[in-house]
Amino acid sequence: MKQFLLGLLLTLIMSTATAHPQDNLTPEGLMHYYVQVLNDENLPALQDVYHFPHLKLVAGKLTVIDDPKIPVIDIDGLKKSGWKYSTIKNVKVLSQGDNAALIELNFSRFDAQGKELLNQTTFYNLTKNKGYWQILSIHSMGSLAGVKTK
């Protein structure tokens, strides 16, 4: 019995050690989590939300980020634009399969006084290759402060 309990405890510890906050999230839930960790300026959590290689198509310019050590979002650049926080106005799952989803996200960015700086609709391709949803690519029709492009 002691060996069984010890084995069970080790299994729980190992599964917790490899757990990701987005493990049980739906594609829509991932988008809410994404904006939450962005607002928290939690760079490690943000990087874990992205799948690498990561693709961005912003205002017609394609950027590929291969290295997960390179931040996808430039928080300092975002702050220089006056950004303090973002909110989601609408999330729509346009298509979803077992390991892929296409999301339409309408969001706003605000300054510290609550003034809306930007309202935009952006499209996200999600993948579940690692067992949990991640953002594989972002497609934006306009330029976005804080979004790295080469």
Q: What residue ranges belong to the model's regions?
A:
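Short, low-complexity N-terminal intrinsically disordered segments enriched in polar/charged residues
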Residues: T11-P44, D48, P68
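A short gly/proline-enriched turn/hairpin at secondary-structure junctions
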Residues: L55-I65
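Surface-exposed, charged secondary-structure patches
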Residues: I70-K115
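Sec-exported extracytoplasmic/periplasmic mature domains
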Residues: V35-L43, H51-L55, D76, K80
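Short beta-strand edge/turn micro-motifs at domain boundaries
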Residues: N119-T149
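Positively charged n-region of N-terminal signal peptides that target proteins for export
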Residues: M1-F4
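A mature extracytoplasmic/lumenal domain signature
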Residues: Y50, G60-K61, G97, L105-R109, ...
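Hydrophobic pocket/interface hotspot
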Residues: Y34, L46-Q47, H54, I103, ...
